[in-house]
């Protein structure tokens, strides 16, 4: 899968799940489950409930995503 196949959306973290998974509510109202990307994990960036995040989704499964950026 190439980077062009995925698209980004903004959302808010609703709650934290085990294994660095998060429930995220997107701007369009959908609720998805997202994990954190490797760069966020490597740099020990903490993601808490209520944080604004950017999520990368694939067209194959719109219920799962990857958190690629945490807004301040």
From Swiss-Prot:
Report the Pfam families cross-referenced here: eIF-1a
Q: Which GO terms describe its molecular function?
A: ribosome binding; rRNA binding; translation initiation factor activity
Q: Which domain of life is it from?
A: Bacteria
CDD domains with a match to the protein in the record: S1_IF1
Known SMART domains for this protein?
Answer: S1
Q: Name one GO cellular component term.
A: cytosol
- Which protein family is named in the record? Belongs to the IF-1 family.
Q: Which PANTHER family match?
A: TRANSLATION INITIATION FACTOR IF-1, CHLOROPLASTIC (PTHR33370:SF1)
Instruction: State the protein's name.
Output: Translation initiation factor IF-1
